[in-house]
Every structure is written in C-alpha cells, then in structure tokens.
C-alpha cells in the first residue's frame, strides 16, 4: 500500500491543549505532526490505499474521532484496537481463576473491561463478592493498559444479590477497608421488578416494599426494604458519582430477536461464626442458627441496625479465639476482629462517631496475643416478660447455694447472715429449727426452674431480681479504697458465661478469669480430721465499680451484699485483649449477616466485624468485544450527505475486529470467540452541545430535541443499510446468520472526554459542556480552555483587554455566563451557553430517551446535579430515566458547593479591571457582583449546622 497524502495545514484545527494531549499520549517520538499519526493509523485499519486515504481525510478534518486503542495502535507493541470488553465471572474454581487472568490480559492490551459478577455470597465454596473484587482492585494497578496507565475495570452486580449493600459502598473512601475497592468502577444491574416496586412506593401509602436478595448459587432468599436500597443507591451516587446504573431488563428486552433465539442475555454494563454463637439483638440474645433467614436488628456498637441472618457455609474450618475477659468465639479464619492499635487511637474514638466503622480489622487467623479490641457501648435491653421465670430472686439464690435432694427436689440450707434473707425467698416448706451446724434447711417450690438456667432474655425486672439472688448467695464485695466491685466464683464456666451474657443485655461488661486449676487440697473430712480432696478448676466473674453504677441506675440492689454506687469519672474499663487463637480442628456450619452501618455485630459478647455504554451478551464461553469510534456532530452539516463516510467508518471498525481476532493471544480465547460470533461495533458521537451552540440553539429547547431525533434517525438508517452491504460482501457472523448483517450490534454512545479535547475542545459525547472556561492540567503545564463559540461572540463585541477581564469573570463564576450583563450577552445566548450544572437534567434524560430507540446498545449518560438537590428530585430523575426507556446511566456529577454557590466576591472584584470596560458593561457587572454577594449571604443562612458548613443532600435540616 502506497503512502497516504497528508495535509499539514490541518494542524491548525487543533488548539494548544489538543496538540499537547496528542503528543503526550498518542504520537510516537519520530512523529512531528498529528497528520503523521492519523496517516499511520488509517493505513493500519484501512482496507486498501483509497479506503485508508479517505479515513485520513475524515480524521484530519475532525469528522471522525478514533478511539484511544485505535489512535494509539502501533505505539505499543502488544496493543490491540479494541476499546471495551465485557466478561463474566462464572462461579466455579476454573471460572474465578480464568476470568481474573483474562481480564488482566485484556487490560494490558489496552481495553477497558466490564465484568459481570455472578459469585455466590460467602459460603464454604466462595468467600463472596467483595473478596474477589479486592483482588481485581489490586490487579487494576498491577496490570496497566499498554504498560502505561492503570487498568480500567468496571464490576457489575445484580441488585438482588445478597452482597449488594457492600457492593454499593465499595468506592466510599471511609468504612471497612476490606470492602473498599477505590481503583474499580462499579455498576448495578437493576431489574424492572425492582423499579416497578419503587414506582409503586412512589405513590405513597403503606406499601410492602420487601425486596428479595437471592444467592445466585444456593437460591437462598434474604430480604431488604426496596426503598432503603434505592435510597442507598442514590445517596452513594451523589457522594461518589457511582454506581453506574444498568436497567438490565430494558437491555435484554431490546436485544435483537436473532440473539434472543440463541438464549443470549446481558449480564453487566466471609466472615462467619459457629451455629451456637449468641447474637445481641433488639429482642435479646439468641443462637445465630435459630435466626437464620430472619430480619432482625443487631447491635453494631452504636445502635441497632436491620440485618438478615444467613447460613454462609457447611463443613467450614473454625478457629477458637480466647479473650482476656473470658469470652471465646468460634469463627472462620477470615472473621474480622476490630482492633485498637494504641491508646492515642482509643482517645480519638471518644469523639469519632465513625470510630467503629473506620477502625482496623484483623482476620482471626492473624490475631496476635495482647492485641486490644475496640471499646464499645452496650444497650440496656428491656427484654420480654414472656421469658420470665418464676421466683427469680429465689432461683438466682438457688443457683448459688442450692442443691437437689435424692428425690430431685430443690432445697436450700441457710447459714450465717444468709438466714436473714428468708423473707425474700419463696420457700415451700422448712424445718423451723436450725440443725446441729446452725443451718436452716428449706425446701423450694417444685416448679422452680432447673439449677443453672439463666434468664438471659427475660424482662429487665426479672433479670435484676435473679442477679441479686445469685450475688447474695455466692458474691463478695471487694474494696480498693472507695472503689468497690463484686466477684463471684464457680466451678461451672459455661454457667458464668451465661451470666456474662445476661449482664451484656443489661448494658454491663464483665470479666471471667480462672481462679485456680484443678488441684488436690487438704480439707476437713467432717469427722474432726482432714484429708486430701480433688478440687475442680474454679472460675471467677468480676463486675467492676462502673458496672455496678450502671446497674444501680436501673434500680438494681442486693439484699445481703452492701455496696455504694459511685459514678466513674471516666471509662476506666480495661481493654479486652487477645489471649490466643486455637486451631481446634472443628468443622461446622457457619452463619453471619451484613450490617450496613458499622459492618459489625456483637457475637458472644464480642464486637467483631461481619460477614454501562457497551451492552452485549456474555456467558462462560464468551467475553464480549466492542470496537468503538465516534462521529463529530460539530461537523454534521459537512458529512451528513457524504454517502461513503458511514460505510467507510463501519468497514474500518470491521477491519479492526479482524486484526483483533488474528493477533489476540490464546489466553483471551473467550474474547476471540465472542468477536467471531458477534462482530459488534459501537459507532457513537461527540460534539452535540457544540453543534447546538454553533446554531445558537439552547440545549433546553424543542428545537434541540428535533435536531437530536433527526440526527439519530438518519444515522440509524444509514448504519442499517451499510450493515447489510458489508454483510453481502463479507458475510454474517454466527450469531447473525441468516440476517444478512455483518455486525450484530452497531451503535453505542461512549464517553469521549479525551477525544473531545483532541478534536479542538468540542463538547464531549452527547453531554453539555461543564464550563465555558476552565483550567486543564497536562504533563506540559496548565491551560485555560475556552468555549470557541462564546469566544467568537466576545471577540466581536470587546477589545482584547476587555475580553480577558470577562474571561476572568467567567472563570471566577465556575465557567458560567449567567452573571454577565444583558448588553454583552442576550438572554437567548445565555440560554445557549448554560453549563451542564445549570441545565435542567430532565432535558438530558429527554434527549437520551429520544435517541435511545435508534441506538441498539446504550449511551454513557452523565447527570450533573447541584449538591443541595432535593432527594425527591433526585429520585424522580432516576425513575424517569427508567420509565423513559434508558438502558444505562453513567456518572452522577455533583458540583462542589464551594464552586457552585459560595463564590468569593473579593476574588471577583480583583479579577476585573473596571476602568477598561465600557461603562454600560461595567455597571451591569457591578450589579451582578451584588447579586452574587446576596446569593452568598442567602446561602450562608441555609448552611447545615450539623455538617461543619457543608450542605448535605438528604439532610432534613437542610431541607
């Protein structure tokens, strides 16, 4: 193929920033002009010399914007001309390993990768979604695109997956680091069923909004509130810009029939404890096994939070963690313990409402002796009188001092000062006389609860009476100066642990230690002599002075033991420390829940952790492949009647697919398989807003809507025509066999931020400009980017110095022109040059919905919202997007308040030299400054006092 003829004069179509970006990111060192880069690439992807020459003409005239992989093709030895891949993680060992390997390979070849996640939640065969996503998060940094920039991975999960709440928040900078994946992008596949439920709730009334979360493997169902889930999605989008939204049923509904007939579907645009573990809930403490499948409220260290308990596995290896307060927990090696590194960190906890959520988490298998667990508050449970036992004080006393006769009847022998407690005891019968040793023998009611039963979940009154009885029987008061505590000893460790749980339900922490091991002791033999006896190990339960004070605040008192409640000056409780971790060899079923706020729950009295635009079908045998490029609508009037333009672009993309199929390494066979069977391309656009501004048409107008529909109607018609032409010349792929088509799918509106800069700062994709002037940083320095059409207007009306001063004003106002005087810009022109954040986003949705019917794949639609948007409006926009038939939503861009509303008046005044601006304009700008000052004043009156000056979307105080 002979060389392409280039036209160096076309370098003038680039601005300085576009040239810098091309040279820094795309051009080879020996290339001195962008024309050489265009010619080289067009030669690689052209069918013959004439086709290549025409492609060069299109690109050099800025009619056609080549995708990054095509534009950089040849610069990296291993790069391939494919922009996007969609993969699917099959829930098998092979699927997990193979997909990870393939995705890393695809990233290194220069493409962005979307990954559908079909992994089950945590069980004995899977550690759940988030642990795998952590691996992908690390790989996105390790395996760079073309060895230059970090990989771009977007993970997609169905909104009925049990791990959806953790998945939604994985890009939040705070919270459990084990679920943070800040280097990944993420999207949610949202079903029609869910949106229909949200729409139903939208009408108000008492609607049952129960939403089933279904494990993709076990099909086990848990539930959440649909409204709560929807609110979490929208709030997270406001805070982080993500997750992307894919209305999955809309995507599948609009697949071509020939794809549906093949059964293809679109799937994307372990912290567990043993069954007997006691969980602190709002209703009491219960074995986690008994709570399986139930929605309950658990204590997370600060408050009660709704969760669903699930069985996470069978025959899982368990470790036993022993702690200094006598508590033990049998859990999986990965179960998270919440650790405090230092006393300094512990002090910060007192003033940090998010201390638990933000604290360090350590796997059980990685715990070391003397590691300190975080302190936490305990609630006082009022309990349930249905669980009360009869004669609570008497039963408590019986547990300490009572025995059974040989006939199995409960009895007490009172001695010393305990005889004075007779009036408090429920006695069935008694001797009336003391025996030879001075004891008073009594027999208790036959319906007394069994000895060592502890009424953990009874009413608070019942628990206090029972505890008073037990401590009066076996307890002792220890005094250290004015500091008093109560200790009680017993040979039955499990019994003391149940008392420890009872105290937890009363808001009190306690400690159990071993008083002594089993030993031989010489004791009186009852016959006047002594002899050796075998003594069992003895354990001691310790209630501190702060614990006693807390009990006294609830009305607790003992009859025999005398102590004075003293309010502690500070939380002097010692930190609970790790003693050791035992590998017991135990294998058992496991259970857990996902607590959404602190990611924590109280287990056996211990607070620990708990457990877009390319829409193509994927499965275990295929990774979808799409080759992209965009048509520049800014030059639409130049190319719309060129009969070869669309055909040449489609032929070029087909050639790029062939290059991929022939040169792809065998390690990405699923992607090659998909490319062969589908041959899907994605023709998109950029420059839509520039096209409107060029014609002085407002984005928010019926005229813009008419042009939008007209453009995409004609594009769809031409693309369909040339799809059949190329099909007749080159044949149809397997999936489209019998249709005459060359490509299964042909259109996708992708984001084009970088391409827009290269194309002379045209507007990106189909979205509005974010600002009419802004600074852009590159490797070569900082550049002031100005709207070209606005610049032309200003140059016709002002001199150079005045223009510079007006640009300063625009920059100071966040790129807006709305504050400029009407004798400089008319009201119509101000409408035309509205920025993305000033445009009513209903128009963004309308234009997207109008063109969606002509686009067989999807669009990357960004929303631009003020941070103080009412949550009702936020909800309505997203609901309307679904109802309007949009397939996907991309980023939600939220303008910073500091830039949007609170503009510094002094900075504005210093930016403008009034002496050199025409008097009429000068006076008008002064007025606009006063308006901004008033705006600032009004804003300050509305500042939320609860968020340190930040307005919080969704905050009732702010609304």
From Swiss-Prot:
Positions contributing to substrate binding: 68, 83-84, 112, 751-755
Keywords: Autocatalytic cleavage, Deoxyribonucleotide synthesis, Disulfide bond, Oxidoreductase, Protein splicing
Site (Important for electron transfer) location in chain: 890-891
Reactions it catalyzes: a 2'-deoxyribonucleoside 5'-diphosphate + [thioredoxin]-disulfide + H2O = a ribonucleoside 5'-diphosphate + [thioredoxin]-dithiol
Site (Interacts with thioredoxin/glutaredoxin): residue numbering on this chain: 955, 958
Description of how activity is regulated: Under complex allosteric control mediated by deoxynucleoside triphosphates and ATP binding. The type of nucleotide bound at the specificity site determines substrate preference. It seems probable that ATP makes the enzyme reduce CDP and UDP, dGTP favors ADP reduction and dTTP favors GDP reduction.
Residues carrying the site annotation Important for hydrogen atom transfer: 84, 626
Annotated InterPro entries: Hint_dom_C, Hint_dom_N, Hint_dom_sf, Homing_endonucl, INTEIN, Intein_endonuc_central, Intein_N, LAGLIDADG_dom
Similarity section: Belongs to the ribonucleoside diphosphate reductase large chain family.
NCBIfam families for this protein: intein_Nterm
Protein name: Ribonucleoside-diphosphate reductase large subunit
Species: Invertebrate iridescent virus 6 (IIV-6)
């Amino acid at each position: 193929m002979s060389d392409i003829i280039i036209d160096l004069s076309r370098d003038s179509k680039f601005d300085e920033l576009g040239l810098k970006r091309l040279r820094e990111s795309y051009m080879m060192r020996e290339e001195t002009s962008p024309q050489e880069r265009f010619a080289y690439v067009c030669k690689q992807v052209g069918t013959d010399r004439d086709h290549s020459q025409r492609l060069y003409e299109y690109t050099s005239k800025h009619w056609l914007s080549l995708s990054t992989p095509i534009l950089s093709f040849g610069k990296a030895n291993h790069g391939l001309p494919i922009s996007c891949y969609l993969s699917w993680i099959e829930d098998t060992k092979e699927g997990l390993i193979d997909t990870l390997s393939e995705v890393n390979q695809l990233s290194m070849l220069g493409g962005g990768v979307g990954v559908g996640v079909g992994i089950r939640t945590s069980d004995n065969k899977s550690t759940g979604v988030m642990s795998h996503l952590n691996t992908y998060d690390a790989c996105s940094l390790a395996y760079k695109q073309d060895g230059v920039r970090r990989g771009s991975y977007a993970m997609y999960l169905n909104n009925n997956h049990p791990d959806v709440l953790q998945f939604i928040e994985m890009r939040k900078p705070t919270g459990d680091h084990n679920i943070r994946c800040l280097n990944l992008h993420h999207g949610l596949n949202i079903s029609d069923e869910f949106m229909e439920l949200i729409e139903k709730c939208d009408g108000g009334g008492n609607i049952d909004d129960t939403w089933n979360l279904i494990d993709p493997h076990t099909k086990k169902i848990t539930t959440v509130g649909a409204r709560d889930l929807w609110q979490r999605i929208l709030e997270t989008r406001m805070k982080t810009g993500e997750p992307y939204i894919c209305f999955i049923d809309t995507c599948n509904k609009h697949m071509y029939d020939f794809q549906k007939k093949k059964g293809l579907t679109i799937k994307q645009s372990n912290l567990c404890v043993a069954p007997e573990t006691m969980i602190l809930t709002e209703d009491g403490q219960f074995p986690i096994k008994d709570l399986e499948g139930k929605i309950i409220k658990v204590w997370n260290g600060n408050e009660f939070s709704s969760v669903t308990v699930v069985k996470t596995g069978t025959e899982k290896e368990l470790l036993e963690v022993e702690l200094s307060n006598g508590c033990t927990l049998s859990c999986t090696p990965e179960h998270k313990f919440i650790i405090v590194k230092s006393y300094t960190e512990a002090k910060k906890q007192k003033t940090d409402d998010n201390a638990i959520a933000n604290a360090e988490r350590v796997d059980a298998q990685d715990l070391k002796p003397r590691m300190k667990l975080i302190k936490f508050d305990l609630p006082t449970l009022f309990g349930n009188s249905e669980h009360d036992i009869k004669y609570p004080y008497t039963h408590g006393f019986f547990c300490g001092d009572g025995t059974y006769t040989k006939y199995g009847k409960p009895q007490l022998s009172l001695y010393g000062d305990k005889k004075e407690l007779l009036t408090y005891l429920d006695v069935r019968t008694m001797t009336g006389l003391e025996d030879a040793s001075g004891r008073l023998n009594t027999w208790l009611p036959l319906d007394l609860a069994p000895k060592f039963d502890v009424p953990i979940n009874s009413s608070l009154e019942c628990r206090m009476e029972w505890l008073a009885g037990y401590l009066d029987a076996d307890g002792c008061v220890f005094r250290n100066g004015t500091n008093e505590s109560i200790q009680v000893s017993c040979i039955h460790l499990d019994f003391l642990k149940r008392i420890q749980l009872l105290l937890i339900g009363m808001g009190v922490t306690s400690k159990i230690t071993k008083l002594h091991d089993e030993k031989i002791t010489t004791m009186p033999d009852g016959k006047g002599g002594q002899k050796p006896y075998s003594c069992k190990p003895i354990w001691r339960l310790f209630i501190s002075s702060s614990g006693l004070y807390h009990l006294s605040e609830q009305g607790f008192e003992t009859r025999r033991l005398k102590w004075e409640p003293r309010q502690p000056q500070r939380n002097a409780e010692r930190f609970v420390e790790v003693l050791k971790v035992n590998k017991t060899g135990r294998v058992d079923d496991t259970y857990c829940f996902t607590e959404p706020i602190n990611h924590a729950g109280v287990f056996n009295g211990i607070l620990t952790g708990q457990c877009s635009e390319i829409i193509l079908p994927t499965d275990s045998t295929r990774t979808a492949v799409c080759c992209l490029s965009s048509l520049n609508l800014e030059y639409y009037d130049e190319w719309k009647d060129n009969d070869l333009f669309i055909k040449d672009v489609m032929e070029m993309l087909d050639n790029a697919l062939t290059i991929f199929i022939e040169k792809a390494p065998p390690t990405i066979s699923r992607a090659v398989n998909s490319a062969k069977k589908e041959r899907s391309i994605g023709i998109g656009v950029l420059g839509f807003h520039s096209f409107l501004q060029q014609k002085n048409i407002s984005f928010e107008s019926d005229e813009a809507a008419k042009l939008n529909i007209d453009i995409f109607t004609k594009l769809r018609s031409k693309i369909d025509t040339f799809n059949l032409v190329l099909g007749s010349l080159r044949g149809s792929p397997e999936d489209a066999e019998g249709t005459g088509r060359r490509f299964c799918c042909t259109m996708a509106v992708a984001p084009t931020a970088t391409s827009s800069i290269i194309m002379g700062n045209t507007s990106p994709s189909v979205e509005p400009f974010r600002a009419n002037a802004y600074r852009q940083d590159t490797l070569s320095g900082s550049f002031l980017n100005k709207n070209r059409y606005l610049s032309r207007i200003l140059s016709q009306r002002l001199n150079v110095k005045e223009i510079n001063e007006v640009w300063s004003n625009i920059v100071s106002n966040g790129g807006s022109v709305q504050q400029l005087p009407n004798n400089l810009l008319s009201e119509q022109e101000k409408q035309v040059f509205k920025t993305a954040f000033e445009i009513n986003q209903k128009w963004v949705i309308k234009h997207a919905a109008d063109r969606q019917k002509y686009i067989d794949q999807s669009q990357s639609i960004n929303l631009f919202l003020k941070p103080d948007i009412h949550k009702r409006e936020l909800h309505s926009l997203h609901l309307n997007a679904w109802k309007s038939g949009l397939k996907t939503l991309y980023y939600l861009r939220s303008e910073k308040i500091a830039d949007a509303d609170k503009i510094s008046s002094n900075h504005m005044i210093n930016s403008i030299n009034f002496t050199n601006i025409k008097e009429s304009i000068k006076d008008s700008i002064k007025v606009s400054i006063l308006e901004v000052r008033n705006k600032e004043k009004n804003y300050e009156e509305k500042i939320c006092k609860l968020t340190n000056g930040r307005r919080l979307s969704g905050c009732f105080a702010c609304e």
